[in-house]
């Protein structure tokens, strides 16, 4: 069983418009509302590829119940921790080939709720074999909250796949308890090191070999349309991917995380892990719906991916 954590989920609302008129009335014909958050995208893709998955995180109020019901309708198991605050909305306005987003900050978690979730998590940890943590921390939690979760996973021997960025990731990296996998994009990688971006292989090798990343088994760096660069223990890989028609890239990173987590759970070899992860990321990009993959195209893309030891 895989446990996914989305500590700051949202109800994602999409408003497609022919044109966005500022300081005027905009009427929307079709509205899409989904259970959102990076971890829930990971959850949906894991469910689609047939992995046993359980979703958790904080939810509150009517919007929190909306998320729970959406997962129920999709036959996805969940064990959220209820809080006093209201789960947030995140609004995307699609207009003239552009996307304007309005993102609520979300509820503030108090000390009692923060401690209560840790106890809740410890109970869930007893019955899972991998944990995928995605996205930002809600207001009120200390920056080391993910590190506290990772410490408990490490004590139980449960691998952690972590997808976050900025100060939250920096805090985890400076902590003695390390995730099994991190998945920064190339910009995030060099920001962590306060270095100028450099896509050359030698620079990437030096970057992921810095002391900041010591103790992390897998570092998988997204290069966007150029594929990926990865380090597994002391081995480096370059992943070349085919050119595809991209319909909606949002959620592709989350689908990649789903592939990594699935491969970790099933003890797949390095090449298959990297190919599965990138295949699912590309499949998501070919769909309008976030966190959705058409598995009919899986084998074709999987076989076109090239993984080279460098």
Curated annotation (Swiss-Prot):
Root EC class: transferase
Alphabetical list of InterPro entries matching this protein: Carboh/pur_kinase_PfkB_CS, LacC, PfkB_dom, Ribokinase-like, Tagatose/fructose_Pkinase
Catalytic reactions of this protein: D-tagatofuranose 6-phosphate + ATP = D-tagatofuranose 1,6-bisphosphate + ADP + H(+)
GO CC list: cytosol
Keyword ATP-binding: yes
Enzyme nomenclature, EC number: 2.7.1.144
Keyword 4Fe-4S: no
Biological or metabolic pathway of the protein: Carbohydrate metabolism; D-tagatose 6-phosphate degradation; D-glyceraldehyde 3-phosphate and glycerone phosphate from D-tagatose 6-phosphate: step 1/2
Alphabetical GO biological process terms: D-tagatose 6-phosphate catabolic process; lactose catabolic process via tagatose-6-phosphate
Pfam families noted in UniProt: PfkB
Family, as annotated: Belongs to the carbohydrate kinase PfkB family. LacC subfamily.
Name the record gives this protein: Tagatose-6-phosphate kinase
Organism encoding this protein: Staphylococcus aureus (strain JH9)
Source organism phylogeny: Bacteria, Bacillati, Bacillota, Bacilli, Bacillales
